Regions:
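Glycine-rich dinucleotide-binding loop and its adjacent helix/turn
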Residues: 122-138, 196-216, 241-303, 411-421, ...
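Local cysteine-cluster metal-coordination motifs and their immediate loop/turn environment
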Residues: 41-63, 85-108
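FAD-site-proximal beta/loop scaffold in flavoenzymes
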Residues: 250-281, 366-440
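Ferredoxin-type iron-sulfur electron-transfer modules in oxidoreductases and energy-metabolism complexes
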Residues: 20-38, 59-92, 109-136, 264-265
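Rossmann-like dinucleotide-binding cores of NAD(P)H-dependent redox enzymes
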Residues: 169, 173-203, 207-208, 297-344
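N-terminal Rossmann-like FAD-binding beta1-loop-alpha1 element of flavoenzymes
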Residues: 142-168, 293-301
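Feature captures the FAD/FMN-dependent oxidoreductase FAD-binding
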Residues: 75, 138-139, 143-147, 195-246, ...
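A conserved FAD-binding loop/helix module that cradles the flavin
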Residues: 436-463
Length: 464
């Protein structure tokens, strides 16, 4: 097979920025078969597979890419499916530049192989062309409970179902999917794709119980007692928003990004018939610089805002959001106000937001995270006229589970404490992973935690 030594990735077809910023259709439109084969031929098949070491779920990346290069897309899918339950999701939202593609040898001198784009292509090809029912293994006589139907819970459920366990997933919201459904907008991750992944788990025998808030409706003790589950995995995420604690945060027109995106993504607040409409003003400030901030800003634009600012206390180079998301936001007309931070939100006579006062920042010495610490510049305050403020400052786990589960150790941030990478908690038979343990992180890291915990749960039960 001849290698393709093009120094750049095959470009991803996308909607025109001036069209897409007015709709919720998917921005990136995916590779054609020809594009996928050509991109796959850029892989030089390193013997030590550095890209695989960068994948939290351990996909054999050179093997699946080799099948793509040969045009055998179903064989490529089967390689991915050995390690990942959600390839169509990961191909769209994983930060490949800091994981698999960040380790790619081609990326040392040129652009890395477009691993995420190829994973997406393979998953989409399989979904559109293969319609065989999954193989359902015989029941092994054991049953387990999963708390939370987000990426960690879905991954653990899928892996345990493949081993023959009777798996029940308890989800607090009215639909399964967790952050994949409520947190990531349709234009980045279509909900039909997430639903299809969930439907695949249902076909494998996984049961989903929605509108079940564990800690209120049932406790972990009840699940392991009268309900007879031999092990429980807690993948309840981190959905409790953080705020700055500045004057004016309780004004009308101030949202957490969590609420703003949930109402838009899950409750379709952008439809005229919506029962949960969002009051998006003409000028919106989104405070924060991560992927969630980009999602909120780009959603606000699509909901009718004329001007949307990203207000971030560090510089453009320090933005934690994916490079692709920042580029897409800039293309769509989002204005980046970096090296500044809000200090107060002001109201009009009716109690609605009318402006925010910000202060300019400069970067000092590195802090504990390794990033340079932002320092206020005395006397540099300025006012920004906005009528909506969206706070995107991270999230913490909900305290319900820890407050209703005696003996479950948590840290000062409310995250569940686990041993090593296996997800074992201080309670026997209780495992945890994803954002409930780490705080807000990436989809693929949550999946990796769910995968590791499923393996540990199986070993625990089989050794009883």
């Amino acid at each position: 097979m001849a290698f393709n030594m093009d120094p750049k990735k095959c470009p991803m077809p996308t909607q025109d920025p001036n069209v897409r910023n007015k709709n919720f259709e998917e921005v990136a439109q995916g590779y054609t078969e020809e594009m996928a084969v050509n991109e796959a031929k850029r892989c030089i098949h390193c013997k030590n597979k550095p890209c695989q070491t960068g994948c939290p779920v351990g996909i054999d990346i050179p093997e699946f890419i080799g099948h793509v290069a040969e045009g055998d897309f179903e064989a490529a899918y089967q390689v991915i499916a050995r390690s990942s339950s959600l390839p169509a999701v990961c191909g769209r939202v994983c930060p490949q530049e800091s994981q698999c593609e960040g380790k790619c040898t081609r990326g040392i001198k040129n652009e890395p192989v477009g691993i995420g784009r190829l994973e997406r292509f393979v998953a989409d090809w399989h979904r559109e062309n293969v319609h065989t029912a999954p193989i359902v293994p015989a029941w092994n006589g054991h049953k387990v409970a999963i708390i939370g139907a987000g990426p960690a819970g879905l991954t653990a459920a899928g892996d345990l179902a493949k081993l023959g366990y009777k798996v029940t997933v308890y989800e607090a919201l009215h639909v399964a999917g967790g952050v994949l459904m409520y947190g990531i907008p349709e234009f980045r991750l279509p909900k039909a794709i997430v639903q299809q992944e969930i439907d695949g788990l249902k076909k494998m025998g996984v049961d989903f119980e929605c509108n079940m808030v564990i800690g209120k409706v049932l406790t972990i003790d009840e699940l392991m007692g009268e309900y007879g589950y031999e092990a429980v995995f807690v993948g309840s995420g981190a959905g409790l928003p953080r705020f700055m604690g500045i004057p004016g945060e309780s004004l009308k027109g101030v949202y957490s990004a969590n609420e703003f995106l949930t109402r838009s993504n899950l409750m379709k607040a952008y439809l005229p018939t919506s029962k949960t409409p969002i009051r998006t003003g003409k000028k919106v400030a989104v405070v924060g610089g991560g992927n969630v901030a980009m999602d909120a800003a780009r959603s606000a634009l699509r909901l009718g805002a004329e001007t949307v600012y990203i207000v971030y206390r560090r510089g453009m180079a320090e933005l934690p959001a994916r490079k692709e998301e920042v580029e897409h936001a800039e293309e769509e007309g989002i204005i980046f106000k970096t090296l500044c931070n809000p200090v107060e939100i002001h109201a009009n006579d009716e109690g609605f937001v009318k402006s925010i006062t910000c202060i300019e920042m400069e970067l000092g010495e590195p802090d504990a995270s390794g990033r340079r610490r932002p320092i206020e510049k005395t006397g540099s305050e300025f006012e920004l006229d906005v009528d909506t403020v969206i706070m995107s400052l991270g999230t913490s786990p909900n305290p319900l589970i820890r407050s209703t589960t005696p003996g479950l150790e948590t840290n000062k941030h409310g995250c569940i404490v686990t041993e090593g990478d296996e997800g074992k908690t201080s309670r026997e038979g209780v495992y945890a992973g994803g954002d409930a343990v780490t705080g807000a992180a990436t989809v693929i890291k949550a999946m990796g935690a769910g995968k590791a915990a499923a393996k540990a749960m199986d070993e625990y039960i089989q050794n009883q």
